Amino acid sequence: MNVPVPPPPDGVLTGPSDSLEAGEPTPGLSDRSPDEGLIEDLALEDRAVEHLVGGLLSHYLPDLQRSKRALQELTQNQVVLLDTLEQEISKFKECHSMLDINALFTEAKHYHAKLVTIRKEMLLLHEKTSKLKKRALKLQQQRQKEELEREQQREREFEREKQLTAKPAKRT
């Protein structure tokens, strides 16, 4: 019985030879090419670079993040200060111009008078709507009452017609 044997790897002799024994690599056939180890070296270098970058990031990143937060806070504070300064400057400009202040007072009086008239009109409209609602309610109640009376009148007429219809007399 003959069992098939898998082929030997490249460069390995399986049969007898005068100078080599079985299983030893053949000289010249298993020599590595000069580019063969570069891929493995690149993979090792990539891992080393990743570890170095990770170490640098873990060392400097917290400080950089704190600095970033501090700068953001300072920037926000600076914006708030600038806004406050602009408001104060505008207040001083308003205070220095008396004509503008007088114009503001007259404008305020004008708008106050408008508000008073609008309020009076709103009160009048409220009173009118209240009266209209009461009147509408009375009319609705009156219509319901009339409808009820008509319905009762129809029922009475129906009963009267019912009584007026001929009924057979009872035999005794």
From Swiss-Prot:
Swiss-Prot/TrEMBL GO biological process terms: actin filament bundle assembly; adenosine metabolic process; amino acid metabolic process; anterograde axonal transport; anterograde synaptic vesicle transport; ATP metabolic process; blood coagulation; bradykinin biosynthetic process
Pfam families per the UniProt record, alphabetical: Snapin_Pallidin
Region annotation Disordered: where it falls in the sequence: 1-35, 136-172
A single MF term (Gene Ontology): molecular adaptor activity
Main location: cytoplasm
Membrane disposition: Peripheral membrane protein
UniProt family annotation: Belongs to the BLOC1S6 family.
Assembly and interaction partners: Homodimer. Octamer composed of one copy each BLOC1S1, BLOC1S2, BLOC1S3, BLOC1S4, BLOC1S5, BLOC1S6, DTNBP1/BLOC1S7 and SNAPIN/BLOC1S8. The BLOC-1 complex associates with the AP-3 protein complex and membrane protein cargos. Interacts with BLOC1S4, BLOC1S5, DTNBP1/BLOC1S7, F-actin, SNAP25 isoform 1 and isoform 2, SNAP47 and STX12. Component of the biogenesis of lysosome-related organelles complex 1 (BLOC-1) composed of BLOC1S1, BLOC1S2, BLOC1S3, BLOC1S4, BLOC1S5, BLOC1S6, DTNBP1/BLOC1S7 and SNAPIN/BLOC1S8.
UniProt protein name: Biogenesis of lysosome-related organelles complex 1 subunit 6
